[in-house]
Amino acid sequence: MRALLILMLSIWMLSLACLATPALAQPAPAAEPTQPLPDIRQRGFVYCVSGILNTFNPQMASSGLTIDTLAAQLYDRLLDVDPYTYRLSPELAESWQVLDNGATYRFHLRKDVPFQTTDWFTPTRKMNADDVVFSFQRVFDSQHPYHEVNGGEYPYFDSLQFADAVQSVKKLDDYTVEFKLKAPDASFLWHLATHYAPILSAEYADVLTQQGRQEQIDREPVGTGPFLLNEYRSGQYIRLFRNSDYWKGLPRMPQVVIDLGAGGTGRLSKLLTGECDVLAYPAASQLSILRDDPRLRLTLRPGMNVAYLAFNTRKPPLNDQRVRQAIALSINNQRLMQSIYYGTAETAASILPRASWAYDNQAQVTEYNPEKTKAILKELGITKLQLNLWVPTASQSYNPSPLKTAELIQADLAQVGITVNIVPVEGRFQEARLMEMSHDLTLSGWSTDSNDPDSFFRPLLSCAAIRSQTNYAHWCDPEFDELLQKALRSQQLSARIEYYQQAQRILEQQLPLLPLASSLRLQAYRYDIKGLVLSPFGNSSFAGVFRENQLQESQSHQSNRDEGKKP
């Protein structure tokens, strides 16, 4: 912990992370060159990140590029979360009321918020209550004409049993919307503040319906965000143009290019040569290079995330919690901290990060005791155990090097006589294959843009999350689920804390997954990039990003104008 604080201080001083979704259409560029770099340093910046894009609609994404990078650029939500105070703040809803002891929520919408004008849609009206009703009815109403479009899967909200929880969402007038729940839910506002809850254009949906092109709603996005989609080249880059009608004011940069074309050391090389202006999720092993280069800056924030190893609890012998405990004892977590995170993470004792208000301070990190592992396996009569470990290939905010992590776990288990076969998987392919339940172990993680513990518990480990394809452990415990429901129904923070701590003790005993690390969020960027905000909950808007020379030029022009006014 001390080393972690020292690293945070040093970086602060230097600077003062497609089967269910059909293939995406690739919008043609509008009056722009097909190569992303020629004029970008004068008219925008390049953001380098790894990831696979399966949808532009955050409602249909489970994590990754859409949530971590694109959502805050293309869309807005009813509510936001302040990245510094962790409190809810107004967004498209300028105010709200909690009624009926948390069973009714009424939102008063902003007026004069325009939707983006794109090559595929020109709006004729501003955002209103019809758009909010459309956006949420599509998710929870199975009879809605857009519910089944592009697969009908909404992983985050499905994991929360959103369709079973919401009784209705109604337009009271053009700028007032009311949600009625079937039971009080203290976490409801927090879920609406996540990037999974964008407001879509109902008018755009109507136009697509008339054209018979409904599937384009998730492929050619229209939102109210600061940037709009101009061009997408699969596996190469995404170009965004600023929204000249953005309701918060004109974004500073005319365009942003999101470079998808390189990973690992390739992205670092691009940053060092100036081909990238911002490097998302640099590997912790690259920190010394980044810190020592005077042309670069680093930002670091605590992250609301967890990396974990999930056990397929429906597959023998992992359906026996004693086997899961034995495997956990054989993993050298301190070596993971040193070899993967280089001091940029805390060893996790719970799926909740330590920053969570419901974190159980009595939680203990699983000890490293391979001899005890051998004894347990011998007692159970288990020999020559072979396991398949499914591993995502792309770096994530919670794990910068998944494949290397898997190799270290493989080596640890080999020491206790367990053979591990590493199976690399990517994107939605990973989710689809995991739902076949043919895996034994999977290395994964979770990050959230909510400060409510429910954003970790239900998506990862509720019974409903098995169907929504986010519960990779395939673990279902009625007692655990009941504790989560009690926490949701309570409006008393102390009671919610107690329920969530009881839930954490069940997880410690049953161990459907092994928490590994809660990682700090890292971002590296060129010295002349200013206004870049790194949030614990995911990426913030790029609307305020600018180059230092642009500011100097603006000040110079203003000075010249002032000089001209002098007598």
Predicted regions and their residues:
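Extracytoplasmic/peripheral linker and loop segments enriched in polar/acidic and small residues
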Residues: 31, 38, 337, 415-430, ...
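Append "and occasionally in soluble cytosolic enzymes with long acidic Gly/Pro-rich linkers
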Residues: 239-242, 318-411, 415, 476, ...
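Surface-exposed binding/hinge segments that line
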Residues: 108, 131, 140-141, 145-205
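Gly/Pro-rich hinge or "lid" segments in bacterial periplasmic/extracellular proteins
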Residues: 82-83, 174-175, 185-251, 255, ...
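Aromatic- and charge-enriched surface segment that lines or borders ligand/interaction sites
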Residues: 94-146, 178, 270, 317
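N-terminal lobe/hinge region of extracytoplasmic solute-binding protein
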Residues: 33, 46-101, 137, 144, ...
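Ligand/substrate-recognition segments at binding pockets and active sites
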Residues: 26, 234, 378-450, 493, ...
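Ligand-site clamp/hinge motif
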Residues: 212-218, 243-289, 406, 419
